[in-house]
Curated annotation (Swiss-Prot):
Belongs to the SUI1 family. It comes from the Archaea. One of its GO terms (biological process) is translation reinitiation. InterPro entries: DENR/SUI1_TIF, SUI1, SUI1_arc, SUI1_arc_bac, SUI1_dom_sf. CDD domains: YciH_like (cd11567). It comes from Metallosphaera sedula (strain ATCC 51363 / DSM 5348 / JCM 9185 / NBRC 15509 / TH2). One of its GO terms (molecular function) is translation initiation factor activity. PANTHER family: DENSITY-REGULATED PROTEIN, DENSITY-REGULATED PROTEIN HOMOLOG. This is Protein translation factor SUI1 homolog. Keywords: Protein biosynthesis, Translation regulation. It holds the Pfam family SUI1.
Length: 99
């Protein structure tokens, strides 16, 4: 199926093209009792959200989950999450941090 979408390109090239087409939003939400949660949206259904979330949680030393097609990380990690997503191959120009 992926071959049809990518015109016969190798899977690595197809994956990189998918990353470049995504527009990612990173924002902070306040939860009960003033708890802060960093929310990362726009990674799309094609991205392996659980793998990305696991990598972010490990690097940020924070808990988190994948819910409704978005990654939620406990605490305010907007800037560091952006830097880590860039290291994972997502273009910095497609990542917007909402203050």
């Amino acid at each position: 199926m992926a071959d049809n979408l990518c015109g016969g390109l190798p899977p690595e090239v197809c994956e990189q093209l998918n990353k470049e087409e995504q527009f990612i939003k990173i924002k902070l939400e306040k939860r009960r009792y003033g708890k802060e949660v960093t929310v990362i949206e726009g990674l799309g259904d094609d991205a392996d959200l659980k793998k990305i979330a696991s990598e972010l949680k490990s690097k940020l030393a924070a808990g988190g989950t994948v819910k409704n097609g978005r990654i939620e990380i406990q605490g305010d990690h907007r800037e560091r999450a952006r830097d880590l997503l860039v290291k994972l191959g997502f273009p910095e120009s497609n990542i917007m941090v909402i203050e």
